């Protein structure tokens, strides 16, 4: 886990350690942690690699999106129970994209449900980035013009400071199946 993220999400660390997790801190954020995890996994045959977001190489984004789809199933069930119909719109925040992928997964074939993902403006890969390849995925990312270096930013939300986004969201953007926009920290606090 990135040292920056460790400092910001201490409660998650406490829970993970309670369940026996061993934590390896690496300098940086989620980006550096994923890169380090992939390097460690590919050089140690006894290790397994599991990613908790819809980022990284296939099949990990699909596995996580499927697991997170329980969110969309709950949205469907509760909407029908409380409103008598499925929702007209689903709006959610997008960092790497796992929570929002889970929220909309159940509704991808429902054209009547408008889907809006909102990124932190400071790290908005879908709205401000360009296509690139890193960490085993082709997706939109914040990077230098020549693609040689990834760029990042900081936001108040620890989970939305990733320099890129899962490839599912890139595909949905390109297919115009989901609308993506961004909001600044100040706008989010209003």
Where are these regions (language model features)?
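Active-site/ligand-binding loops adjacent to catalytic centers
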Residues: 31-34, 38-59, 63, 83, ...
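Buried hydrophobic positions in well-ordered alpha/beta secondary-structure cores of metabolic enzymes
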Residues: 16, 75, 90-92, 97, ...
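Phosphate/pyrophosphate-binding loops at sites that engage ATP/ADP/AMP, CoA/4′-phosphopantetheine
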Residues: 77-85
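A short, small-residue-rich loop immediately preceding and capping a beta-strand
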Residues: 1, 85-100, 118
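A glycine-rich, Thr/Ser-enriched phosphate-binding loop motif common to dinucleotide/cofactor-binding enzymes
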Residues: 60-74
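Active-site-proximal loop->helix
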Residues: 1-38, 125-134
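A glycine- and small-aliphatic-rich helix-loop capping segment at beta-alpha/alpha-beta transitions
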Residues: 14-15, 105-116
